[in-house]
Amino acid sequence: MSAPGPYQAAAGPSVVPTAPPTYEETVGVNSYYPTPPAPMPGPATGLITGPDGKGMNPPSYYTQPVPVPNANAIAVQTVYVQQPVSFYDRPVQMCCPSCSKMIVTQLSYNAGALTWLSCGSLCLLGCVAGCCFIPFCVDALQDVDHYCPNCKALLGTYKRL
């Protein structure tokens, strides 16, 4: 026969491989230094033998240090600063500074400078038969006061002019 090809079996006796070598045998780790003997469990080493016969360390108990009262202790006070709220002609959700509750403000419309200017302008244009009082009925021409619905405190005012 000729030389074996890539897909032909080699001629001769077949050798069954044995177990591969261990890592230490392959790399040669600790080949010059002998391994130290394992510690014997018992009272000499501080190990306690458990119910399964294996050694285990005794539990370490940690005592928490007792805090020492400091005569120079400083009391810390937290101060919350509320951002300024801009009031417009719509209800505003905010924390009431009087009752410290989260609320949505109630609105109240009052005659302001724009209402009176509108009334005066209508009088000058000739609406003297009562039509000059129409601005007092239109909320869009009046100032707006914001009140807390819980404690009824005045929280702010929106002036149109």
UniProtKB/Swiss-Prot annotation:
Membrane topology term: Peripheral membrane protein
Q: Does the keyword Membrane apply?
A: yes
Q: What induces it?
A: Up-regulated in macrophages exposed to lipopolysaccharide (LPS) (at protein level). By estrogen and lipopolysaccharides (LPS).
Report the outcome of Y61A.
No effect on interaction with NEDD4
Q: Where does Zn(2+) bind?
A: C96, C99, C148, C151
Q: Where is this region: Membrane-binding amphipathic helix?
A: 111-134
Q: Single Gene Ontology BP term? A: regulation of macrophage cytokine production
Q: Where is this motif: PPxY motif?
A: 20-23
Q: Where the protein is mainly located, per its record?
A: cytoplasm
**Where does it localize?**
Cytoplasm; Nucleus; Lysosome membrane; Early endosome membrane
How is this chain modified after translation? Phosphorylated on tyrosine residues in response to EGF.
**GO CC terms, sorted:** cytoplasmic side of early endosome membrane; cytoplasmic side of late endosome membrane; cytoplasmic side of lysosomal membrane; cytoplasmic side of plasma membrane; Golgi apparatus; Golgi membrane; lysosomal membrane; nucleoplasm
For molecular function, the Gene Ontology terms on record are:
DNA-binding transcription activator activity, RNA polymerase II-specific; identical protein binding; RNA polymerase II cis-regulatory region sequence-specific DNA binding; WW domain binding; zinc ion binding
Instruction: Provide the domain comment.
Output: The PPxY motif mediates interaction with WWOX and NEDD4.
Protein family according to the UniProt entry: Belongs to the CDIP1/LITAF family.
Question: So what does this one do?
Answer: Plays a role in endosomal protein trafficking and in targeting proteins for lysosomal degradation. Plays a role in targeting endocytosed EGFR and ERGG3 for lysosomal degradation, and thereby helps down-regulate downstream signaling cascades. Helps recruit the ESCRT complex components TSG101, HGS and STAM to cytoplasmic membranes. Probably plays a role in regulating protein degradation via its interaction with NEDD4. May also contribute to the regulation of gene expression in the nucleus.
> What is the protein name given in its UniProt record?
Lipopolysaccharide-induced tumor necrosis factor-alpha factor homolog
Q: Where does this protein come from, organism-wise?
A: Mus musculus (Mouse)
Lineage, opening ranks: Eukaryota, Metazoa, Chordata, Craniata, Vertebrata
Q: Which gene encodes it?
A: Litaf
